[in-house]
Amino acid sequence: MLEKFFKLSENHTDAKTEILAGITTFMTMAYILAVNPSIMAATGMDSGAVFTATALAAFIGTLLMAIFANYPFALAPGMGLNAYFAYTVVIGMGYTWQYALTAVFAEGIIFILLSLTNVREAIFNAIPMNLKSAVSVGIGLFIAFVGLQNAHIVVGGSTLLQLFSVDAYNKANGVEASFNNVGITVILALAGIIITGILVVKNIKGNILWGILITWTLGIICQFAGLYVPNADLGFYSLLPDFSKGLSIPSLTPIFGKLQFKGIFSVDFIVILFAFLFVDLFDTIGTLVGVSAKADMLDEEGKLPHIKGALLADAVATTFGAILGTSTTTTFVESASGVSEGGRTGLTAVTTAILFGLSLFLSPIFLAIPSFATAPALVIVGLYMLSNVTNINFTDMSEAIPAYVCIIAMPFFYSISEGISMGIISYVVINLITGEAKDKKISALMYVLAILFILKYIFL
């Protein structure tokens, strides 16, 4: 049955590989179950209810990806989009979280229509192959940087970024942490990178997953030995699962279906809606391009078969997520970790979805996975994705420069969508001014996108 539905042999994989890949993807993105409630709670939303909404949105979205597209991609409420929701729309602009959820709901409906009418698919196919390869490389740098940041290996400083030290960490965050909380976690993360790297070199099956589990176990040993001292006030929690509150599922009642349609025709609402639309659209396209390129899923023309199903799953998940009570649900770049483990079909996504469903009942275990244990996985996956740099044509500067701009913009501006927009603008402008555009037959949609991106930078 699995073979028939997921076409395992056709995709050169097997059930064991797919399940392991699904577990790996879940382990690298399980942090969202802890981080999203924390961010959304800043708006006054019930954190327990947001945890339930987050797990359910991830479960529904990832399952839809498997059913609609048979791809190994996982979905969950997106980082960055949740921060925009909480700190810009609600706290910064003064709107209620119910109003912000309504904008997310409207975005989902619009995306469903765009997906059904092939607009999103057309945008995906309009991007030149060189830029698609650049997106993959840029995402590799981006998620490697996220991993280093999550592990506090790099911290803010006078040069914007610098190598970790306890003093530098304290100055950057305005806290008084010590070696026994932040310092030891950095050492554990570095050890995790080395351990995971060795497992990769030795070609150990499930190397990324094993890297996460070994690093977490080392942390628990350090906690028992007194080398790691939890401090909840500073964000350093016990590495042991907390079953003191049992295994009950937090109620959704405080946030379920709390949409507020009053004032949706205001200019502010349109601006908020457009921001959600823009970031989600190009983050999703960027993730699909990057991860698909790494998995060799793109056809000879650089197109992704069944992309309509993938985009529709993303759109429907966002709509359901808003009703459940969480910010935009989107395709996660951490899906690359499962792809790196050999995941090629929807069975990987089904496995990840099931684990998100189980997390509702086993939240203490999943919430205990620390960021320093998942950080090495992100760093190593970044290495995997960098390999696509060999597909970029560096002999043609009209191709190389836009690719370069796209690559460096993602980590430097901390945004996949900004990298894509700058890559598209530079590609169109350079090829148009140099006269290369005629020979390359650049898609008309690329010109439209470039103009829209320029207008965005001018007016938003």
Residue ranges and their predicted role:
Residues 2-36, 57, 78-87, 91-139, ...:
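Helix-loop-helix junctions within the multi-pass membrane cores of secondary transporters/permeases
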Residues 12, 16, 191, 270-274, ...:
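Alpha-helical membrane-protein architecture signal
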